[in-house]
Curated annotation (Swiss-Prot):
Gene3D superfamilies: Nucleic acid-binding proteins (2.40.50.140). InterPro entries: NA-bd_OB-fold, Ribosomal_uS12, Ribosomal_uS12_bac. This is Small ribosomal subunit protein uS12. Residues 113-124 have a biased composition (Basic residues). GO terms for molecular function: rRNA binding; structural constituent of ribosome; tRNA binding. Belongs to the universal ribosomal protein uS12 family. The streptomycin sensitive allele is dominant to the resistant allele. With S4 and S5 plays an important role in translational accuracy. Residues 105-124 are annotated as: Disordered. Part of the 30S ribosomal subunit. Contacts proteins S8 and S17. May interact with IF1 in the 30S initiation complex. The modification 3-methylthioaspartic acid is found at residue 89.
């Protein structure tokens, strides 16, 4: 426990919170252009080919973003919207591409959790 004199001399240091998605620059989403669309493999216990894209953002950053859902229509020069949110088994992937906005099509034949995948309500 510091004395009052010690606190006057050296005040307590404020704890600075480090952001988990610096490329967004405190915005909820950011627009960007795909520079490369490819698949990558996850960390140790899991096995798959995860779809990811390298995206150059309007904030000047170039980040790796995950493409959620089954099937996608993205290619180089596609304009996409990204949000924060990491993929636990892909190191370095800290952003998600938002389906159903700009050049990204929604997931076809999606019936549950449609809003998360940009899918329209199916005809009854």
């Amino acid at each position: 426990m510091p004395t009052i004199q010690q606190l006057i001399r050296d005040e307590r240091e404020k704890i600075t919170k480090k952001t988990k998605s610096p490329a967004l620059k405190n915005c909820p989403q950011r627009r960007g252009v795909c520079t490369r669309v490819y698949t990558t493999t996850p960390k140790k216990p899991n096995s798959a080919l995860r779809k990811v894209a390298r995206v150059r953002l309007t904030s000047g950053f170039e980040v790796t973003a995950y493409i959620p859902g089954i099937g996608h229509n993205l290619q180089e020069h596609s304009v996409v919207m990204i949000r924060g949110g990491r993929v636990k088994d892909l190191p370095g992937v800290r952003y998600h591409i938002i389906r159903g906005t700009l050049d990204t099509a929604g997931v076809k034949d999606r019936r549950q959790s449609r809003s998360k995948y940009g899918a329209k309500r199916p005809k009854a």
